[in-house]
């Protein structure tokens, strides 16, 4: 959310564009990210989006088959939506890229992106064991970064989106399992200094035939969540309240 307007994007494919919509779900504007001479911007597999006062950060981090060597986060200026740059990264312990035989059960896919303190954080979507690994990225560095897992959480599901509220010290994630059940996962008192506290709440979301991919914290009991159109239902935005 930027200036009371929701900002979203397509998943993989299509134009590298941002879409702006209101509370009624009406698209009120769109902005194609210009391909500048130095930065080639593509929607390889955009998965999540977050922002601070100066920049929007777009996670081009989708890696279903573990064969991407061009994972990156795109930095977009909030004042004019011009491209500031890209933060390229790779995973330290990934030795195989499965170019010839795509592999679906691996931990080098990531769909959740959020800001915490002065870092960008991403959480893996691990089909091999249904855990999630937390990685931290220096948002000021322009050099390629090699990421190493800071901690692993046994969420027993596949993480598809995340948001962090620093005032509430609350991390909110959405996920699903192989049966199609959707979950809200809440880490309270979540800070970089206490990542080892692995306590979280996992709440089943009573929505069927939807692929929930994004979440925004309103307060510690209320959240916006959105689903995408993947052939199993229409895209929707829901306001979710928990007790």
What do these predicted regions represent?
Residues 1-243:
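Sequence/structural signature of beta-propeller domains
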């Amino acid at each position: 959310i930027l200036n009371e307007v929701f900002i979203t994007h397509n998943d993989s494919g299509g134009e590298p564009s941002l879409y702006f919509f209101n509370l009624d779900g009406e698209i009120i504007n769109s902005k194609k990210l210009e391909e500048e001479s130095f930065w080639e911007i593509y929607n390889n597999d955009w998965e999540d989006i977050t922002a601070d006062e100066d920049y929007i950060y777009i996670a081009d981090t989708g890696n279903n088959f573990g064969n991407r060597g061009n994972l990156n986060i795109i930095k977009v200026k909030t004042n004019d939506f011009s491209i500031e740059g890209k933060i390229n990264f790779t995973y330290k312990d990934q030795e195989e890229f499965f170019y010839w035989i795509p592999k679906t059960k691996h931990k080098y896919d990531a769909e959740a992106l959020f800001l915490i303190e002065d870092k960008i954080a991403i959480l893996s979507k691990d089909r091999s064991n249904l855990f999630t690994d937390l990685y931290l990225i220096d948002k000021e560095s322009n050099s390629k970064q090699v990421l190493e897992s800071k901690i692993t959480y046994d969420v027993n599901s596949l993480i598809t989106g995340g948001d962090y509220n620093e005032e509430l010290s609350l991390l909110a994630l959405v996920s699903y399992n192989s049966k199609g059940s959707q979950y809200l996962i809440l880490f309270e008192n979540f800070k970089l200094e206490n990542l080892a506290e692995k306590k979280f709440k996992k709440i089943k979301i009573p929505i069927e035939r939807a692929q929930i991919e994004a979440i925004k914290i309103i307060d510690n009991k209320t959240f916006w969540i959105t689903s995408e159109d993947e052939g199993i239902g229409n895209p929707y935005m829901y306001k979710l309240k928990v007790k």
